[in-house]
Every structure is written in structure tokens, then in C-alpha cells.
């Protein structure tokens, strides 16, 4: 299975259709059904009340994700003072999450409700690829943001990344993600599967070279787990732990101790939230997909589709959590959001001039007094 598993494995759908309860205590093979009967999946996702809950859950995530990520992108484009290197990375994260909202969730919900692939052969190849691409860009960008903060705060580097370099990094993130996601487009098969005579379903499944139970699928899943979860989580956790330690041990001038203490607390909370959200949201889905590839009997679970869907919903919650963590928890973004709603374009020029002037004076005085440098100020503002 791919790194996102946007559609539940069609093999499990086929297995469930082959054998279905026909009465208390026994089952009837599909080949013995009455002539006018039609196969139906007997899992919880076919219950109307469950479908209503799933529709509400997915629609809520789509709405929150589209609004939140669109706002982040909008304020970075609209306000000149927001066009910093870190904010470019955050905007790129918002673009990737926005693609996840628009490309992952609607198709996953459609498949879950309908039980088969209804989007045609072209989208059978393109949709999983686009989904994998968006998720990988999002993960790489989260890692880049952590490394950028670590570089500026822990090592006090005076030479910051230029905007040109930041765009190059963003381009590389998309290029690497496009390459890593390519197997999801190449190794796919759009086909009709006959369940019983005169009844077929449309399937869009992974088709790896070699035998039916190819090792390639398992290798790809293990690689995806390592590249998209284990390695990024390790880098992000290490970077933010170093940042937290640096902020904790930094000594501020006596007059501003309370001010910087409060800002450190806010920064620490945000850093912890970033790591926890990433770890908790993606672990169930990655682990479940890996279990499917290692042991195909997982597909025989009666509630396979429901379990998969719940884990997928948990993972997708990160798409609206990211703009909250990187945007709304930041005072500059909050002001920009409010200004955008009020259409106060003039505030941008004023904010830019005043903030740069006051910041320069404050940093000059702080440096003379042995106070905090610019990297610590930025640490609580990114």
C-alpha cells in the first residue's frame, strides 16, 4: 500500500463479497444467491448512521482545512511583512495540506461510501499519485521548518537563508516528493473483478511486478514508513528539543525576564504540540498499512474498512491542525488574519516599517546589555 492509503484495499472488498451472512448462524456462498439478489458488503460503513458520521467528519476536516490553509497562503501573499523565509515554508506546508484536503478526502469518502472505484482509469493512476505527492511534501516541509528554526536559534547563525534559497528548497521538496510518489502512479491496475456470474465491481489496486504477493509492495511500505514518519519524527523531535533547551537556558536581562519567560512558555507549548500532533495523527494509519502488507489476513477483518477509515480521519486532522499551530498560535499571523478580514491593507506597510525600526533599536540595546539576540526574538514569532 502507498504512503497515504487513500482508498481501502480492493482485495478486502472482494473477499467480503464472496461470503456473506444469509441468516443466523450460517453463511451462503455468493454463487448460490437468488437470481434477483445483489451482493452487498456487510460492514459498518454500509450502515446509514455510520455513513452520516463519516460524511460529517470528512466535510468538517475539509472545511477547516480549506479555510485555515487558504488564510495562511492569503496573508503571506497579501502582506509584505509576512514574506519571510520561515513564512514561505509555512505557506508551502499550507499548499500541500490544501491539496490533501481537496485530493485525498473527497475521493476517500466517495470510495468508502460506494465500495468500488467510480472515477475511471485515468484518475485511478493520477489520484493516488497526487495524494502521495501532497502528503510527502507536507512531511518534508514540516522537517525543513524544524531544521530552519534549529539552525537559526541553536547556532545563532547570522547568515540567514535567502528567499531565493528558500524557493530552491521548496522546489526540491516537490521534486523529491514527485519522485518518491511515482510508484503509486506506475504500479496500479484498473480492472473489473467478477464476484459472481453477471456481477462485477470496478477495482483500482496496486499492481507490483512479480508474483501476486510481491515483496515490492512490502518494501515500498517499509520505506514509506521510514521516510514519511520515523525519520521526520526523529529530526523534528531532536530539533525542537534542542530549541527548547536553548530557550530554557538562555539568560535574559532583568527588566525583561517576565516578558521573555512568557514567550518561551508559548514557544515551548507550540513545539510540543507540533511533535505530538505529527506523531499521534500519522502513527495509526502508517502502522495499519504496514500490518496489511506484512500479514494479508488483516484484510479479512470484518471491520477492516471502518478501522482504515477511522485511522485515515485521524491522520487527516493534521491538515487543519498545522495552520492552527504555525498560524493562529503566532501573534503576527493572528494580526494578519484579522487585517485580512477587515481589508486593512494599509496596516501592512505601517507594521513593516515600525516593527523593523523598533526591532533594530531593541536588538542594538539588548546586544549592548548582553541581552537576547534576534534569533531568540524570531524563535517566538515564527
From Swiss-Prot:
Annotated family: Belongs to the G-protein coupled receptor 1 family.
Gene that encodes the chain: NPY2R
Segments on the Extracellular side according to the record's topology features: 1-46, 109-125, 188-217, 291-305
Listed SUPFAM superfamilies: Family A G protein-coupled receptor-like
Lipid linkage positions (S-palmitoyl cysteine): 343
UniProt keyword terms in alphabetical order: Cell membrane, Disulfide bond, G-protein coupled receptor, Glycoprotein, Lipoprotein, Membrane, Palmitate, Receptor, Transducer, Transmembrane, Transmembrane helix
Record region (Disordered): 1-39, 363-382
PANTHER family membership: NEUROPEPTIDE Y RECEPTOR, NEUROPEPTIDE Y RECEPTOR TYPE 2
Family annotation (Pfam families): 7tm_1
Cystine crosslinks: 124-204
Cross-referenced InterPro entries: GPCR_Rhodpsn (IPR000276), GPCR_Rhodpsn_7TM (IPR017452), NPY2_rcpt (IPR001358), NPY_rcpt (IPR000611)
Residues listed as glycosylation sites in the UniProt record: 11
Domain of life: Eukaryota
Task performed by this protein: Receptor for neuropeptide Y and peptide YY.
Cellular component, GO annotation: plasma membrane
PROSITE patterns: G_PROTEIN_RECEP_F1_1 (PS00237), G_PROTEIN_RECEP_F1_2 (PS50262)
Membrane topology category: Multi-pass membrane protein
Cellular compartments annotated: Cell membrane
Transmembrane segments: 47-67, 88-108, 126-146, 167-187, 218-238, 270-290, 306-326
Cytoplasmic topological domain: 68-87, 147-166, 239-269, 327-382
Protein name: Neuropeptide Y receptor type 2
Lineage: Eukaryota, Metazoa, Chordata, Craniata, Vertebrata
GO MF annotations in UniProt: neuropeptide Y receptor activity
